[in-house]
Curated annotation (Swiss-Prot):
Superkingdom of origin organism: Archaea
Cellular compartments per GO CC: cytosol; glutaminase complex
Name assigned to this protein: Pyridoxal 5'-phosphate synthase subunit PdxT
Keyword Lyase assigned: yes
One Pfam family of this chain: SNO
Length: 192
């Protein structure tokens, strides 16, 4: 059985939990989700989802609780959406705590503020997908080790490096389990 942790601090936590459980069921995988807020919470998790919110606040929480060091040391798979993508990157246009697990540079709020949020049909990993962008960042630079999963308007909006997946938009706000299934497969491949 696998356990997917969902950081229970900000963002669409419940929505991530619902769509992850839906994806597990569709894939017929014995798994569960668990809300995570402390180091003790994450110890039995095989993967972690970091959702949207204020990335600097989430980053400070990860450092204060010891979760940041734990995530770097253990290498458990992480799906980061919106603010989670920012946290996974090595660099951003703001001075803030980062996990630095994806060799990328991210522009926070790259597509604009709240009033400039939008939805668009995109290709994700060569599949049709409905992207929901809310104060979305984009990736301005990547190393050769980073795989591009999606672009919008020539801007990189989804990447994967090793067991880390970063998404600029909000897959938890759709009914489409494509991205969560990709993450679950990554978690499964890392479980010994």
């Amino acid at each position: 059985m696998i356990t997917i942790g969902i950081l229970d601090l900000q963002g669409d936590v419940e929505e991530h939990q619902i769509i992850t459980e839906k994806a597990l069921k569709e894939m017929k995988i014995d798994g569960t989700t668990k809300l995570v807020n402390t180091l003790d919470d994450i110890k039995d998790c095989n993967g972690l989802i970091i959702s949207g919110g204020e990335s600097s606040t989430i980053g400070m929480h990860l450092e204060k609780t010891g979760l940041s060091n734990y995530l770097k040391e253990t290498g458990i798979p992480i799906l980061g959406t919106c603010a989670g993508l920012v946290l996974l990157s090595k660099k951003t246009d703001q001075d803030q705590p980062l996990l630095g697990l994806i060799d990328s540079t991210v522009k926070r709020n790259g597509f604009g503020r709240q009033r400039m949020s939008f939805e668009s049909e995109i290709k994700f990993n060569n599949e049709d997908y409905h992207g929901i962008f809310i104060r979305a960042p984009y990736i301005s630079q990547i190393s050769d080790d980073v795989e591009v999963l999606s672009k919008y308007d020539d801007k990189i909006i989804a990447v994967k490096q090793n067991q880390y997946i970063g998404i600029a938009f909000h897959p938890e706000l759709t009914e489409d389990t494509l991205i969560h299934k990709l993450f679950i497969l990554e978690v499964e491949s890392c479980v010994v």
